[in-house]
Amino acid sequence: MAGMQLDEIIEYLRYSKHIPEETIYELCLKCQELLVNESNVTHVDTPVTICGDIHGQLHDLLTLFEKSEGIEKNRFIFLGDFVDRGFYSLESFLLLLCYKLRYPDRITLIRGNHETRQITKVYGFYDEVIRKYGNSNVWRYCCEVFDYLSLGAIINGQIFCVHGGLSPDVMTVDEIRSIDRKQEVPHEGAMCDLLWSDPDEVDTWSLSPRGAGFLFGKNEVDQFLHRNDISLIARAHQLVMEGYKEMFDGGLVTVWSAPNYCYRCGNVAAVLRIDDDLSRNYTIFEAVPAQDNRGNAIIPTKKPQMDYFL
């Protein structure tokens, strides 16, 4: 790709080194060609590690892989929100794309509510690209990849993975497969809800305070599990100070993988490994220090923009 080999690009990204614009264009194009053949809901076998929001925290993403013994030996599902708020959204997303090309059967990338043109223009990713490249071309290339990301995954036919949650317009996983995903995320409807909805202690569907998606409760989760003959919904989308949170008698779990979110929240992060017997094993990890052993800044001192809600 523009004179750079894939493994060389990976090494550059791990150290947040500059990648030529032409190389990023070719990388994004190759990823689209790969992702277009994937279903809206990707089938994944165990063992697999489920990862929540990353939000541009590159160094913590590298820690995540280290704690999980690396992508060379394991499968991973990332539940979206790769970009915005952190300082290294571009490097984080491109690194995951490189891994997708390098190990296509070992990594599944699901779209989050931040993988849209509208959201990234407001919450950091667009401005980051302008700052690093002086124009919006790289942002546009990445946004085109967003449109090809899957909306969910099914692990061993038993665990449904999604970024946000459920939708009153979708009763079965098969209905999700019929959605036209190759578009900007709509402001309402099933595709929007899957990326924006949240679980809560409510009796029935309620409008979300986020302004998009719905709140759903135990009844909706139990019905979805029963109707689809599955045992668990794994999702991300909400900060959890302890890294993960199980709800509704273990029928739903929120996984959060961005420690010390926005470099100030003080939370730990988690990933969830699902073994062949469908047992759940959580790994908790903390954020990388702000400085290395020599006192050099790893994380810039300027804080990213804080916005609509954590």
Curated annotation (Swiss-Prot):
Functional description taken from the UniProt entry: Involved in the dephosphorylation and activation of the transcription factor GLN3 in response to nutrient availability. Forms the histone H2A phosphatase complex in association with the regulatory subunits PSY2 and PSY4, which dephosphorylates H2AS128ph (gamma-H2A) that has been displaced from sites of DNA lesions in the double-stranded DNA break repair process. Dephosphorylation is necessary for efficient recovery from the DNA damage checkpoint.
Root EC class: hydrolase
Family annotation (PROSITE patterns): SER_THR_PHOSPHATASE
GO cellular component terms listed in the entry, alphabetical order: cytoplasm; nuclear periphery; nucleus; protein phosphatase 4 complex
UniProt keywords, alphabetically: Cytoplasm, Hydrolase, Manganese, Metal-binding, Methylation, Nucleus, Protein phosphatase
Enzymatic reactions: O-phospho-L-seryl-[protein] + H2O = L-seryl-[protein] + phosphate; O-phospho-L-threonyl-[protein] + H2O = L-threonyl-[protein] + phosphate
Listed EC numbers: 3.1.3.16
Compartments, record wording: Cytoplasm; Nucleus
Designated name of the protein: Serine/threonine-protein phosphatase 4 catalytic subunit
Similarity comment: family membership: Belongs to the PPP phosphatase family. PP-4 (PP-X) subfamily.
Modified residues (Leucine methyl ester): L310
